């Protein structure tokens, strides 16, 4: 079992196969409900999980479990069940306190409180309620190492630190000088003093962008009704959780006041269950730390170098971005002035940065805090960093066991239905015109049959059919044999073949997210058409007859792009023959086929062994692929696209 620690309150569980913090290939069910956040496609730690005082059982099933549990039970599944108030009554609680210690964060108090109350009014009616609260200080990420492994430090011109934010914004200062000369804002010939050198903006540390508070508040409640004198039960369960944490995805995100809720109705007996529930999330005050720093940097004071010129005018002429351009212009002017004064190139760079940084907002000041709050409350990524999301999942499951009708085997059938409603107002998904809705459904059956004396040999066979409205149907069979040896059946040998699949996640299909130096684009055809952006063309490009701006949509990334590796080879050699089309394909459902051989045995009263050997074979594996799309020309034309 792998546990990836993203932050103090956010741990991602995985068993077999590939995973990141955003583990969309592992399912966690709490009393039959998937506790994944609709916007993220994975559980946000234990935000909506159980309190420790209400845990009845936890079962971990490694490997593909799609035959019974459907899409995404790919690497494994964690089944968690809470205590029923008919069986567990009374008031109980738990309090834990300790210290977290880190060189960057120091020593900080950690507190964790859980309270449970259950009451049985009669043999027909029972209720319960739970409350949990956790408070601590999150781990501080403070690495200044260059994220591209170039060995650069903050003293270098193009440093992009792992936990320095805002320095993602960079440009070639020679191009800046040429633009300024072309606009008449700098004397002709000044561009000859400026080297072709990429320079990045001065960034902010993570401690300047978040307070690193780790907090979780959650509550759940349930009403359970048994109208007859048997195990027939009708129940309603509600769950609510909110908290603050840090999430590491493509960028670094401050998750603040993120809220999730679930509401479930279930009817069950010994032979069947029918449940339906809704999961809803709200991004609260969550924000992107990278864009927070980028847009704080854009609150740059007026420059004496360019009186009467607006940053929008500079942006229209090809400088990096509205709000950054004056900084780079000031850098160039400071560099040129120092060079004319006899400075070395290194001294001129220092003079240029010093001149440009004279106008930045200093962390820790009241002005900085005011601007930061303005940025993190604005969802427009050109000047803000706030996430907006209020997505929902509607889900239903049913199952029937024929144990009262069939005595020669254990046979059950079941099915599920899920409806997605994605609503990020265009800040995460390409839902610019309203919520994105789509559905998937599935049915399954399983047979378990015992053979030989005392039914020591057991055959289990299952099959499931699932259909997502964007893809062809998937059939996932599973078959296994287990044999119990020994006088007391204390040696279990098992052999199994199973299949699993994972439908592309909501982000795989519909994401349309700006992450600074790149754009994340999902591969749904509708998403590709909806993702449309305008980009300024440099003066060199305009000299080739290209307009001052171009419009690209998501299709460009898939159908007109170069592979990053080939562009790197071209940049190093200047040989355009090395450029290659990216060849990126649309996502399809992932599939895995697994063969497993295992043994579990109790060798003595105090010693037991559980071991397994397995092999997984994957197809249609989904991953993020970086590509470079030219602003003009067609990939393979050997002309404009190369110049771009």
Segments predicted by a language model, with ranges:
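Extracytoplasmic beta-strand/coil segments of soluble accessory domains associated
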Residues: 1-34, 56-57
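N-terminal periplasmic accessory domains that precede
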Residues: 11-17, 26-29, 43-48, 60, ...
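Residues on the lipid-exposed face of transmembrane beta-strands in outer-membrane beta-barrel proteins
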Residues: 17, 115-119, 219-225, 263-269, ...
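Short acidic/polar hinge/loop motifs at secondary-structure boundaries
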Residues: 34-62
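Periplasmic-side early beta-strands and strand-to-turn transitions of outer-membrane beta-barrels
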Residues: 94-256
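Transmembrane beta-strands of outer-membrane beta-barrel pores
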Residues: 97-101, 133-137, 227, 238-244, ...
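Face-selective signature of the C-terminal outer-membrane beta-barrel domain
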Residues: 264-471
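Membrane-embedded beta-barrel scaffold of Gram-negative outer-membrane proteins
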Residues: 526-643
């Amino acid at each position: 079992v792998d546990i990836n620690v993203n932050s103090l309150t956010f741990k991602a569980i995985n068993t077999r196969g590939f995973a990141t913090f955003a583990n969309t290939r592992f399912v966690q069910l709490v009393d039959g409900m998937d506790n994944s956040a609709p916007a993220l496609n994975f559980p946000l730690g234990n935000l909506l999980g159980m309190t420790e005082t209400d845990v009845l059982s936890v079962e971990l099933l490694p490997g593909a479990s799609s035959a019974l549990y459907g899409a995404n039970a790919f690497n494994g599944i964690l089944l968690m069940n809470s205590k029923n108030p008919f069986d567990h009554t009374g008031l109980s609680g738990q309090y834990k306190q300790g210290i977290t210690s880190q060189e960057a964060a120091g020593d900080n108090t950690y507190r964790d409180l859980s309270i449970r109350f259950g009451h049985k009014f009669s043999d027909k009616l029972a209720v319960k309620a739970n409350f949990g609260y956790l408070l601590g200080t999150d781990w501080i990420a403070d690495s200044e190492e260059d994220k591209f492994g170039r060995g650069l430090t903050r003293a270098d011109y193009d440093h992009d630190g792992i936990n320095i934010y805002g320095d993602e914004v960079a440009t070639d200062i020679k191009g800046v000088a040429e633009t300024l000369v072309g606009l008449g804002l700098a004397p002709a010939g000044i561009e000859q003093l400026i080297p072709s050198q990429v320079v990045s903006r001065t960034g902010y540390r993570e401690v300047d962008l978040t307070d690193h508070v780790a907090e979780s508040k959650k509550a759940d409640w349930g009403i359970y009704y048994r109208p007859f004198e048997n195990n027939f039960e009708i129940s309603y369960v509600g769950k609510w959780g909110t908290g603050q944490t840090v999430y590491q995805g493509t960028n670094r995100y401050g998750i603040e006041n993120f809220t999730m809720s679930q509401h479930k109705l279930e009817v069950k007996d010994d032979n069947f269950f029918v449940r339906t529930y809704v999961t809803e999330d709200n991004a609260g005050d969550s924000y992107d730390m990278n864009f927070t720093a980028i847009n704080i940097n854009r609150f740059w004071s007026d420059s004496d170098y360019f009186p009467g010129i607006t940053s929008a005018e500079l942006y229209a002429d090809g400088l990096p971005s509205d709000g950054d351009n004056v900084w780079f212009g000031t850098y160039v002017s400071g560099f040129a002035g120092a060079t004319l004064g006899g400075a070395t190139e290194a001294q001129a760079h220092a003079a240029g940065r010093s001149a440009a940084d004279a106008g930045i907002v200093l962390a820790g000041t009241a002005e900085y805090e005011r601007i930061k709050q303005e940025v993190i409350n604005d969802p427009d990524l050109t000047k803000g960093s706030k996430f907006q999301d209020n997505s929902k999942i509607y889900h239903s499951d049913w199952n029937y066991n024929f144990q009262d009708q069939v005595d020669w085997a254990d046979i059950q059938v079941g099915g599920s239905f899920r409806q997605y409603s994605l609503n990020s107002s265009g800040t995460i998904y390409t839902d610019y015109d309203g919520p994105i809705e789509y559905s998937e459904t599935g049915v399954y059956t399983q047979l378990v049959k015992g053979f030989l004396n005392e039914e020591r040999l057991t055959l289990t066979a299952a099959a499931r059919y699932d259909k997502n409205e964007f893809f062809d149907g998937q059939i996932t069979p599973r078959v296994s044999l287990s044999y119990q040896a020994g006088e007391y059946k204390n040696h279990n040998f098992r052999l199994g073949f199973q299949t699993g699949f994972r439908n592309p996640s909501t982000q795989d299909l519909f994401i349309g997210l700006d992450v600074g130096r790149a754009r994340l684009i999902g591969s749904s055809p509708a998403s590709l058409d909806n993702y449309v952006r305008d980009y300024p063309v440099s003066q060199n490009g305009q000299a080739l007859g290209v307009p001052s701006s171009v419009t690209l949509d998501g299709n460009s990334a898939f159908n007109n792009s170069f592979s990053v590796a080939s562009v790197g080879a071209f940049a190093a050699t200047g040989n355009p023959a090395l450029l290659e089309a990216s060849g990126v394909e649309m996502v399809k459902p992932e599939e895995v086929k697994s063969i497993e051989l295992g043994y579990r045995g109790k060798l003595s009263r105090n010693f037991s062994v559980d071991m397994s050997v397995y092999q997984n074979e994957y197809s249609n594996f989904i991953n993020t692929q970086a590509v470079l799309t030219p602003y003009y020309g067609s990939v393979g034309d050997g002309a404009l696209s190369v110049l771009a």
